[in-house]
Amino acid sequence: MSMRDVLISRLIVERYFEKLRNSLELDVAIVGAGPSGLTAAYELAKNGFRVAVFEERNTPGGGIWGGGMMFNEIVLEKELENFLKEVEIEYEVKEDHIVVDSVHFASGLLYRATKAGAIVFNNVSVEDVAVQNGRVCGVVVNWGPTVRLGLHVDPITVKASFVVDGTGHPANVVSLLAKRGLVEMKTEFPMDADEAEKFVVDNTGEIFPGLLVSGMAVCAVHGGPRMGPIFGGMILSGQKVARIVSERLR
């Protein structure tokens, strides 16, 4: 084996552990690297907050990539045009709506969030939250494959002033509190894009002290309808949760 093989390994290990060590105490831990989570990460990081996103899958981006039924295009409301210009995502305006290539959109959000300073930990699952004095104060993390395989391996804890559940339809983080009777959780209702886009933004916010909910998780928690491959509500929800947290941290 050449010394270069060892060098490659050492550089990866050193850089990753530096990144992890610097993320053990955060302003905001975002769970789920979908559209609302990445938008919130971008907005918070560009304003100087220490933000990390924990994504249990290998591929961040949530439900963006597949567009509608694997037709890799998505739709947004016209009001998102300024945001797309800000993050330099290309789009077309058709019939008073915005159409975007879903692969371009997902990769653009990922680039902007990480460029702004957010750290994305893919293949890392949040298996629990830390609660002290009646308030969520961090996340309990383990390797995604470890959790999926049910291996008996203890996790580690990351401290965070606020935690955002951006895990989409399952609302995984809120579910952890609901099964212990700490919060009430409803269920997602059938498709209604018009109502859902408004519902998800209106109901974005704190569900338990220190824990906020954004994106499709809002519909699962509060009993809102789903909306399919229109993503304006996801972006607006991510922006709203970032504003709420920013105001609380200042």
Swiss-Prot record:
Positions that bind glycine: R226
Taxonomy, superkingdom: Bacteria
EC top class named in words: transferase
InterPro entries, A to Z: FAD/NAD-bd_sf, Thi4_fam, Thi4_prok
Keyword hit for Iron: yes
Single GO biological process annotation from the record: thiamine diphosphate biosynthetic process
Binding-site positions, NAD(+): S36, E55, E56, G63, V126, H152, V153, D154, M216
A GO term, aspect molecular function: pentosyltransferase activity
Keywords: Iron, Metal-binding, NAD, Thiamine biosynthesis, Transferase
EC numbers: 2.4.2.59
Annotated binding of Fe cation, by residue: D154, H169
Cofactor: Fe(2+)
Listed pathway(s): Cofactor biosynthesis; thiamine diphosphate biosynthesis
UniProt subunit comment: Homooctamer; tetramer of dimers.
Function recorded in the entry: Involved in the biosynthesis of the thiazole moiety of thiamine. Catalyzes the conversion of NAD and glycine to adenosine diphosphate 5-(2-hydroxyethyl)-4-methylthiazole-2-carboxylate (ADT), an adenylated thiazole intermediate, using free sulfide as a source of sulfur.
PANTHER family referenced in this protein's UniProt entry, alphabetically: THIAMINE THIAZOLE SYNTHASE
Similarity remark: Belongs to the THI4 family.
Listed NCBIfam families: sulfide-dependent adenosine diphosphate thiazole synthase
Protein name: Thiamine thiazole synthase
Gene responsible for this protein: thi4
